[in-house]
């Protein structure tokens, strides 16, 4: 197989990034935007010894799983990798992704996986689900400001104010901001030169409260003629918070370290279940509130709290899971590295009149081992104990020193919430080699039309 060869391929599998996989005379090709079951014509773009990457040129025979994408930019934009795949098939793909990682990385057998796996929790309406969107700003060839999303693996902006995954209010807000920029000759930020003012716009929406936040990330300290923009934005029903976040760094970090209120208050509120949360521009908050309620409900179900338990919630963010758990537990301790998030968690506990949740700032892999060692010193060698430990780590998973401490504390249950089933499988392998067994495992589709899937696992001490 050589570069620029044109080949006809039947797509027989899906890669972890959503690309179609096919074979030509035993040679494996990865083809972006091809759907399992398609027969396609593809052009080889990169040829290695045993495999290569090809560009989809034409769908010769469409798969039964191929659907018309809702967004005209689906193939070019880097946001939705599998929008041309039917939603039912997306859920099968995500289930297989979790199972594949558990088998390949975790070393679990198919029988073991079949025993514990439950079907992926999907969405009834898998579009318009995001309560948060961050739009980069740039300039077109005519020097007009544009906004949209980055093309896959680039920082080239695909101009689009109407993302199918976001709420309908996003379009109106972005059009108002673009008009304000044109009328007042305000330039978009240029990554290459470091000049220009508007870098990004963050929009948050409360699905239960209908409150809207707009935060403009600016390459400076102020927004010229801000009152003209505010006058238009506050006409949108639900507008609650308009802020700016200064960010003059020459890097890819989106938000600045702080924000200033231009109008309204510095936060919006929303609910997950019956718990109310205060969300600032810098808060971490799950982007799909419909599925988050199911995700946390599953974590609570797996924890099966009776009311007399001590629970640790590691990587607790703004206390989203902690406050859910606190309603059923005797005491909850939350740990999070971001100080602002812990401030939010404490405020959220106060808002909900929850007084049995305590929060600590620090790395989970440092705070828990330090707590364990200190407890042992102060109690004449007696070991610290937790009834349930919940972990919700970033993509890199849990540090091994943290897993060691979890095992030492001998909780009856560990509830592991994961955004990357590969690192989940690695960590489950460690826990299962050290006195635990998986009882239940289930995917929750937080991100329809993308390759990402959350997973919740219950481990029980043997």
Where do the protein language model's features map onto the residues?
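Rossmann-like S-adenosyl-L-methionine
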Residues: 2-5, 16, 221-236, 240-462
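Terminal RNA-binding accessory module
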Residues: 1-73, 111, 359, 366
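Residue-level signal for inorganic ion chemistry
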Residues: 22, 37, 80, 201, ...
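Short beta-strand micro-motifs enriched in acidic
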Residues: 43-47, 136-140, 204-208, 462
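Short, solvent-exposed loop/turn elements at beta->coil junctions and helix N-caps
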Residues: 118-126, 191-192, 200, 204, ...
């Amino acid at each position: 197989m050589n570069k620029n060869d044109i080949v006809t391929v039947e797509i027989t599998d899906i890669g972890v990034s959503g690309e179609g996989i096919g074979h030509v005379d035993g040679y494996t090709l990865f083809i972006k935007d091809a759907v399992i079951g398609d027969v396609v014509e593809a052009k080889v773009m990169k040829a290695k010894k045993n495999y290569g990457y090809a560009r989809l040129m034409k769908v010769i025979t469409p798969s039964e799983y191929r659907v018309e994408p809702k967004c005209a930019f689906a193939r070019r934009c880097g946001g939705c990798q599998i929008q041309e795949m039917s939603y039912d098939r997306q859920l099968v793909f995500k289930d297989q992704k979790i199972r594949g990682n558990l088998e390949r990385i975790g070393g679990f057998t198919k029988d073991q996986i079949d025993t514990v796996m439950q079907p992926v929790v999907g969405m009834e309406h898998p579009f318009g689900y995001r309560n948060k969107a961050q739009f980069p700003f740039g300039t077109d060839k005519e020097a007009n400001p544009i906004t949209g999303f980055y093309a896959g693996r680039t920082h080239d902006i695909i101009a689009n104010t109407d993302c199918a995954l976001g709420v309908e209010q996003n379009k109106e807000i972005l059009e108002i901001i673009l008009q304000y920029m044109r009328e007042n000759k305000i330039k978009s930020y240029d990554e290459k030169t470091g000049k220009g003012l508007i870098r990004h716009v963050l929009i948050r929406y409360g699905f239960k409260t209908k409150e809207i936040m707009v935060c403009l990330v600016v390459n400076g300290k102020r927004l010229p003629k801000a009152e003209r923009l505010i006058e238009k934005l506050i006409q949108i029903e639900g507008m609650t918070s308009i802020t700016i976040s200064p960010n003059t760094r020459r890097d890819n970090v989106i938000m600045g370290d702080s924000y200033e209120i231009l109008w309204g208050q510095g936060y919006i509120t929303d609910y997950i279940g019956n718990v109310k949360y205060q969300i600032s521009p810098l808060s971490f908050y799950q982007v799909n509130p419909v599925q988050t309620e199911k995700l946390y409900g599953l974590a609570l179900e797996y924890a099966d709290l009776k009311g007399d338990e001590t629970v640790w919630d590691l990587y607790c963010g703004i206390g989203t899971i902690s406050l859910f758990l606190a309603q059923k537990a005797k005491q909850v301790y939350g740990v999070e590295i971001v100080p602002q998030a812990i401030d939010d968690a404490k405020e959220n506990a106060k808002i909900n009149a929850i007084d049995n949740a305590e929060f600590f700032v620090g790395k989970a892999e440092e705070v828990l081992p330090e707590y364990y060692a200190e407890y042992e010193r102060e109690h004449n060698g007696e070991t610290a104990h937790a009834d349930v430990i919940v972990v919700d780590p970033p993509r890199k998973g849990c540090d091994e020193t943290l897993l060691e401490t979890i095992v030492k504390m001998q909780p009856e249950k560990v509830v592991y919430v994961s955004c990357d089933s590969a690192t989940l499988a690695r960590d489950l392998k460690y826990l299962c080699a050290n006195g635990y067994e998986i009882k239940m495992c289930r995917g929750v589709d937080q991100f329809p039309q993308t390759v990402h899937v959350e997973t919740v696992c219950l481990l029980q001490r043997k």
